Amino acid sequence: MTVHTEYKRNQIIASSEIDDLIFMTKPQEWSFEEQKEIRDKLVREAFYFHYNRNEEYRNYCINQHVSDNLHTIDEIPVFPTSVFKYKKLHTVTAEDIENWYTSSGTRGVKSHIARDRLSIERLLGSVNFGMKYVGDWFEHQMELINLGPDRFNTNNIWFKYVMSLVELLYPTEFTVDNDKIDFEKTVKHLFRIKNSKKDICLIGPPFFVYLLCQYMKENNIEFKGGDRVHIITGGGWKSNQNDSLDRADFNQLLMDTFQLDKINQIRDTFNQVELNTCFFEDEFQRKHVPPWVYARALDPETLKPVADGEIGLLSYMDASSTAYPAFIVTDDIGIVKEIREPDPYPGVTVEIVRRLNTRAQKGCALSMANVIQKNIKD
């Protein structure tokens, strides 16, 4: 399908090579090796940017015996996301911070992340970039129904904000207020858009989509989506883990409820507040890491990269963030895979398997966090 997606380009300031990459290109434009070369260059540039402008991060690097004379980007010091729970770390000046965003806080203390205008614009660009894995429509060809609040009512909770950004790409109806779904309104818009002959994109947390399916089943609502409905989830099940379905069962529930033609009409996304990029799935439901982000799986105890395709502690270096150094080790255990030609979607994929759960693994992460706390002073 030809690329037709239009976003508010007059709101975007394309200031560099990375902005051209994020805002003006498609995911399938480069080979695996070309993506690798692009990633190396952009991550290096991001490291130099933060190293030279952020004294706290530079001191941390020096403590790790790392200067700005890198041999490989694997040498770039990363830190656990828990640092952002206790330290407001930012590279840009306080005057340039557009907003502070928080995690959902389902696991206790919230992370606080500063973002300037350019970082926010690049996040929007990553959503537009990722949507091209799903399909490409003129603005008048599709409408979205968001099982969440609009971006003015997210209370700075990061994932809600990320999901609300689609409003800037396509006409969008929001059907959740104060974390309560208006089921009647949602169903009304489903049928309205269907009758308008436009395609429909339903987005929201998997638990909310699950609740909508239950409502439609209980009320005997039959909806024949065919090939015109696309469902995009994100954010995980969080505090609703007891109600969670495995991916195969969840796929089947959506296929049955919305009478979809193909399973590839269902996509999941990944983002976290400490990461400035949203990862989208391709038609095979594999989450792709864009070429401006370097993803690795690390040994939880040594923090050394494991072999391609092996399970480890997920770490990201995101070159799109100017507000803060987005060089992080997460609490997620997962798998990073290199996808090469002749696959139609060459690049790097990530699969999140589970959270850290052993005392040894958490101890390693906490030990690393303590080291950083001593070297990044308030």
UniProtKB/Swiss-Prot annotation:
Reaction catalyzed: a long-chain fatty acid + L-cysteinyl-[protein] + ATP = an S-(long-chain fatty acyl)-L-cysteinyl-[protein] + AMP + diphosphate
Q: Does the keyword rRNA-binding apply?
A: no
Question: What is the main EC category here?
Answer: ligase
Q: What is its EC number?
A: 6.2.1.19
* Functional pathway: Lipid metabolism; fatty acid reduction for biolumincescence
Query: Which Gene Ontology terms describe the biological processes this protein takes part in?
Result: bioluminescence
Disulfide bond positions:
none
Can the keyword ATP-binding be found in this entry's annotation?
yes
Entry keywords, A to Z: ATP-binding, Ligase, Luminescence, Nucleotide-binding
Q: Name one GO molecular function term.
A: ATP binding
Supply the Pfam families for this chain: LuxE
| Similarity section | Belongs to the LuxE family.
The free-text function statement in the UniProt record for this protein reads: Acyl-protein synthetase activates tetradecanoic acid. It is a component of the fatty acid reductase complex responsible for converting tetradecanoic acid to the aldehyde which serves as substrate in the luciferase-catalyzed reaction.
Q: What is this protein called?
A: Long-chain-fatty-acid--luciferin-component ligase
> Which source organism does the UniProt entry give?
Aliivibrio fischeri (Vibrio fischeri)
